[in-house]
């Protein structure tokens, strides 16, 4: 069972429809017990970083997400949800994030139109489970004005938009997609299937303990 965290700032409907399409078991929730009972977690997000962190704090979800990370449960952040996984952001004001991934969220420094919106090529930087079954150079759908300034060793895929934009990041059981898999057609569905596979593998490992 995958928990989609509903904190009032996510693209919940499209993520829900995508999981339904691939046949994944899921629940949309902000309940701490349900999140911790799940086998994997998706943190979606649309909007401003400081507001999102305020809402997560108000709903006591920051400690839950950190516990999810600590116990090794697979966690996937999408768009703003990915950005929240990092240590801090400069959006609107200096603001602390969840601190589950090293790095900071910064404004895109490009001469191109901001937000970066539309389809872009995703190039492989290193292997990780969410690349399974994907062709290097597949096109995915972006909508964002900020990017993750983070260590190279956690960057698994990049896109060019006047600069290299980390599209895929990962460290241990924590995964992030700056683009929207749920809006990226069959490529996106494969990515979500791959995450579903990671979740099932983690669930099986817990049953054998």
From Swiss-Prot:
Protein localization: Cytoplasm
Listed GO CC annotations: cytoplasm
InterPro entries assigned to the protein according to its UniProt record, in alphabetical order: Class_I_gatase-like (IPR029062), GATASE (IPR017926), Imidazole-glycPsynth_HisH (IPR010139)
GO molecular function, one term: lyase activity
Signal peptide start-end: none
EC number per UniProt: 4.3.2.10, 3.5.1.2
Matches recorded under PANTHER family: IMIDAZOLE GLYCEROL PHOSPHATE SYNTHASE SUBUNIT HISH
Quaternary structure note: Heterodimer of HisH and HisF.
NCBIfam families: IMP_synth_hisH (TIGR01855)
Protein name: Imidazole glycerol phosphate synthase subunit HisH
Native species: Bacillus cereus (strain ATCC 14579 / DSM 31 / CCUG 7414 / JCM 2152 / NBRC 15305 / NCIMB 9373 / NCTC 2599 / NRRL B-3711)
Upper classification of the organism: Bacteria, Bacillati, Bacillota, Bacilli, Bacillales
């Amino acid at each position: 069972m995958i928990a989609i965290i509903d904190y009032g700032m996510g693209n919940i409907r499209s993520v829900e429809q995508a999981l339904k399409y691939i046949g994944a078991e899921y629940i949309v929730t902000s309940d701490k017990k349900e999140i911790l009972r799940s086998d994997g977690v998706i943190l979606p997000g649309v909007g401003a970083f400081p507001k999102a962190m305020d809402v997560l704090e108000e709903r006591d979800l920051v400690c839950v997400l950190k516990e999810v990370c600590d116990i090794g449960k697979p966690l996937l952040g999408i768009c703003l949800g990915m950005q929240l996984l990092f240590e801090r952001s400069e959006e609107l004001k200096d603001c602390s994030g969840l601190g589950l991934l090293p790095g900071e969220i910064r404004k895109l420094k490009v001469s191109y139109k901001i937000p970066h919106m539309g389809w872009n090529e995703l190039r492989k930087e290193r292997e990780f489970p969410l690349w399974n079954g994907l062709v290097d150079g597949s096109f995915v759908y972006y909508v964002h004005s900020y990017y993750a300034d983070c260590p190279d060793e956690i960057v698994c895929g990049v896109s060019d938009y006047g600069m290299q934009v980390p599209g895929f990041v990962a460290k241990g059981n924590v995964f992030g997609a700056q683009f929207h898999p749920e809006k990226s057609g069959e490529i996106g569905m494969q990515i979500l299937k791959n995450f579903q596979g990671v979740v099932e593998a983690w669930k099986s490992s817990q049953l054998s303990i």
